[in-house]
């Protein structure tokens, strides 16, 4: 059958009748006049303190999200009750939709359930379902679903649609179909989103007849298809070689007021390219040109290559996508000889192109593609450009893009700006890619950038906190001798104490004294906190206590204190006032 024939055009009627009661109350009435003689002055009501209007919900949600993401749960559990937040379904749901780490999201969900006067509703439950479903934790998702049933929480079409989507995405089409039937049996009427998701699942599983029946049922239920519904139909038709029928739907949907959007056009052209349907692609490109719709960069590149292979003109494609002409020119005009000599003018031009794409268009996917091409062709970019790429990728938490740019700088022998190295270190620490931190520090030292006393000590401490004492020692060894002060030595001692190796900490102390570096208050606190727990260093503990007492009594550490001693004390002293 032809899908384009299944259309309806039912006029919508509006009633203009007014209720007689409303007409009666709409007649003009005289207002009683109050006598000034007996009128009473309004009582003064004590004004309530209004909340600070500058504190927006998005700021509250962002604060809670940062606590969940960057703190361990014990710390987060202590901070959350003291935020002064009125915990309601809206706030809880917004926090969950911000996608904190899955485990933290579940702990936060359970923590919120214990708040006095708060109960989870179907909004928060459905969001928690989505989090587990997106992570592929289908059994956990089902557990939350059963919990909803036990608690008597309303289960609506939105909840069922989410379940059907994630269950089908996991490959269990039969399970998704059972959920569909359960939804219908429970009286939940499907929406256009439900119908569309279910049809897409059936088409993908090759159940064309069932998908067709669902579409007919959708029309009989007077649910109007939207752009995504038509896109699902056209995507299936193009994949089966029925491009004329797909075009028929493409134009008829416009006649009834549904305009194909950017997502629809990109999906259709990607599908047409996959099956070599260039004529269909041309018809869609004409519509895109008339309506100002553009392609995503990867699809544009694929379309460019397909038209070139077919010997067809790409003028229309370039005209529609003039916004990415910089990328296309760069990808086509680069010398294809890998060992070609690159002069200063060419290098400057390529740097300008990359800067334009990154800083003006913020198209980081395109930048990744260009970097790979330039690495293959041995083209060297300016240091400030590669540094900007790394910093922008780190700002957006794109670890892959930042790693790609860093690897490119290594191969090309490019020394980066200090801010780029620090951004990389922070990014790799957050993503727990600790061995890469050492690579960055090595390159930073080669580029003659200094970590500094504070950052060096903090990095050593952070690697020790991640239970990687070997990496912490590597960072210490990479530091120049003039940066191996009391803060760095104390940080390394703290690493070994935490790792259960007090003998190594004492060895570091002896090495520090040999270099005539005097311990600070923080050094004594670190050593005593670890050595007091073992009976192997009783003599050393007694001596360290005596030295610490002498240091405190002399008050030398409070008056003319060296900056390194002050940093060490701020980082490691336990009761510094």
From Swiss-Prot:
GO-annotated molecular function: mRNA binding
Keyword Repeat: yes
InterPro entries: Pentatricopeptide_rpt (IPR002885), TPR-like_helical_dom_sf (IPR011990)
Chain positions of PPR repeats: 121-155, 156-190, 191-225, 226-260, 261-295, 382-416, 417-451, 452-482, 485-519, 520-554
Keywords (A to Z) from UniProt: Repeat
Disulfide bonding pattern of the chain: none
Pfam families in the record: PPR (PF01535), PPR_2 (PF13041), PPR_3 (PF13812)
Coiled-coil annotated residue ranges, if any: none
Keyword Repeat applies: yes
Xref: NCBIfam families: PPR
Family recorded in the similarity comment: Belongs to the PPR family. P subfamily.
Name of the protein in its database record: Pentatricopeptide repeat-containing protein At2g01390
Organism: Arabidopsis thaliana
């Amino acid at each position: 059958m032809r899908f384009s024939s299944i259309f309806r055009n039912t006029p919508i009627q509006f009633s203009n009748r007014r209720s007689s009661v409303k007409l009666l109350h709409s007649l003009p009435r005289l207002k009683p006049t109050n006598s000034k003689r007996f009128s009473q002055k309004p009582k003064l009501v004590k004004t309530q303190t209004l909340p600070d209007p500058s504190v927006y919900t998005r700021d509250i949600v962002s604060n809670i999200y940062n606590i969940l993401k960057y703190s361990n749960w014990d710390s987060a559990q202590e901070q959350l009750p003291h935020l002064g937040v009125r915990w309601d379904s809206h706030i809880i749901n917004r926090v969950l939709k911000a996608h904190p780490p899955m485990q933290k999201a579940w702990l936060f969900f359970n923590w919120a359930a214990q708040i006095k006067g708060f109960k989870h509703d179907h909004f928060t439950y459905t969001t928690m379902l989505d989090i587990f479903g997106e992570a592929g934790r289908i059994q956990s998702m089902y557990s939350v679903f059963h919990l909803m049933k036990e608690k008597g929480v309303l289960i609506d079409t939105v909840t069922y649609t989410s379940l059907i989507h994630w269950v089908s995405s996991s490959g269990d089409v039969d399970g998704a179909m059972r959920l569909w039937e359960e939804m219908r049996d429970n009286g939940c009427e499907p929406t256009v989103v439900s119908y569309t998701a279910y049809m897409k699942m059936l088409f993908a599983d090759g159940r064309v007849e069932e998908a067709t029946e669902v579409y007919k049922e959708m029309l009989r239920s007077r649910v109007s298809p939207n752009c995504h519904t038509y896109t699902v139909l056209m995507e299936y038709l193009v994949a089966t070689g029925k491009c004329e029928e797909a075009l028929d739907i493409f134009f008829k949907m416009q006649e009834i007021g549904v305009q194909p959007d950017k997502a629809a056009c990109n999906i259709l052209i990607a599908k047409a390219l996959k099956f070599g349907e260039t004529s269909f692609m041309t018809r869609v490109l004409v519509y895109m040109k008339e309506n100002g719709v553009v392609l995503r960069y990867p699809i544009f590149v694929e379309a460019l290559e397909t038209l070139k292979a077919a010997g067809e003109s790409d003028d229309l494609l370039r005209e529609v996508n003039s916004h990415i002409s910089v990328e296309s020119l760069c990808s086509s005009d680069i010398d294809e000889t890998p060992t070609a000599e690159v002069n200063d003018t060419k290098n400057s031009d390529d740097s300008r192109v990359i800067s334009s794409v990154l800083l003006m268009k913020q198209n980081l996917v395109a930048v990744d593609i260009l970097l790979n091409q330039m690495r293959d062709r041995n083209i060297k970019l300016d240091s400030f450009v590669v540094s900007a790429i790394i910093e922008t990728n780190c700002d957006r938490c794109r670890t892959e893009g930042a790693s790609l740019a860093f690897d490119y700088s290594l191969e090309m022998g490019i020394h980066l700006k200090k801010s780029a190295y620090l951004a990389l270190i922070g990014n790799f620490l957050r993503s727990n890619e600790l061995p890469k931190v050492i690579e960055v520090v090595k390159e930073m030292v080669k580029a003659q950038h200094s970590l500094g006393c504070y950052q060096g000590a903090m990095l050593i401490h952070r690697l020790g906190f991640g239970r990687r004492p070997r990496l912490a020692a590597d960072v210490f060894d990479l530091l120049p001798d003039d940066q191996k002060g009391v803060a760095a030595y104390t940080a390394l001692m703290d690493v070994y104490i935490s790792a259960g190796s007090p003998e190594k900490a004492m060895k570091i102390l002896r090495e520090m004294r040999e270099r005539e570096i005097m311990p600070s208050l923080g050094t004594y606190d670190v050593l005593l906190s670890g050595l007091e727990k073992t009976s192997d260093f009783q003599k050393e503990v007694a001596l360290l206590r005596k030295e610490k007492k002498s240091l405190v009594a002399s008050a030398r550490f409070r008056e003319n204190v060296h900056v390194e001693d002050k940093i060490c004390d701020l980082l490691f002293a336990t009761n510094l006032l």
